[in-house]
């Protein structure tokens, strides 16, 4: 099959993919020349009665829970559509900050609905690409031919709606999923037309094997790297140096913009204090950040060889020079124990607090082959078959996950005991969300416009319908 792009965007009930939900999905398939194939998708997804959406999120999107219930697909229907119609073989799934946001929501959707959460991005020629870091590196090194916006604070911004406005691209209803998809395709065309070499190179570099070839600890070489973690004043781009491997199959890299001398002799404890400092600690006047970060090979990092800086004033564009980079690299190479201490720290870094909710436990481990077969059987079972289907899962996450799956999509199949378990979980889950939900309603109400007041009223009614015992 010929490769195609599928550009997509989500509007969600909040920012946490473990507990928040997709409310709107939009997408458009294109050929490799960015010409549309077929009609766009623009659908709502029903919000279930175990979720209190973030009022702040709905102020932006304008989508109410009631609207999703009236017009939306169920999660089961939506997951099947994604699997069978959208993320088909040889599809490149493309978004704007999708690696860190949208893709995580898709993974958790698939996990809840008994689909493999990863195959849609790698199996049978499938892959993914994130245009946000492509935009960052293009702006930093090959800005010619594109107008790059400044925000209302006078600072460079890579927000999609500002890029489209600066370049005369129609983008009404920013934060409507379909409008954002249309805008993203237009911005992609802009980069492809004005900087075709950069475009082709970064498209190719979505392959993690090519990233590994450029950035590895067996043949350490400095490389150009654009990331949201880097300084805005330097176009989010620097020259980095691979130090050591990380526990998650990536590599720890050092920002060669900064002199390593203050850091190379620090103890494990002192380095750990910097790496794991809280937000409050980082705000202290005397806090000096450690310029290291993890690069994940499978997250489409925007990287390129150092040679790209020799063309078109590249060094000047990112306010660096070869002499500084070489000097700082030499210091790192003369202190190999520094890399070893970092490796130890990252390999033994504190685990996140373990989740008790099976829906939030996606990353607690991979399923074994026997459970993968059972998961497929659940997904393919008819409603009648599911009623008496009680597979003996090896993984303890899956039995409660099956109960939730049945409760949301086939509630008439629940026994009295299963219904009691579900209602207990649902009530506990809603009560945990309630304090923040109420705080947000109260904070937003005084300054809300008429349109926003309607949304807040709908949220109040939603709360009363899913938690009728609450005195609103």
Feature roles, as predicted:
Residues 1-5:
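N-terminal accessory regions of nucleic-acid-interacting proteins
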Residues 7-9, 255:
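Short hydrophobic beta-strand that contains or immediately precedes a catalytic carboxylate
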Residues 11-18:
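Short acidic, Gly/Ser-rich segments with clustered Asp/Glu that frequently serve as metal-coordination loops
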Residues 20-25, 29-63, 85-196, 202-205, ...:
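Metal-dependent phosphoesterase core characteristic of DEDDh/y 3'-5' exonuclease domains
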Residues 61-81:
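Metal-dependent phosphoesterase signature
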Residues 193, 204-284:
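Acidic catalytic cores of enzymes that act on phosphate-bearing nucleotides/polynucleotides
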Residues 245-420:
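Long, charge-rich C-terminal accessory regions
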Residues 398-400, 405-471:
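C-terminal amphipathic alpha-helical interaction region
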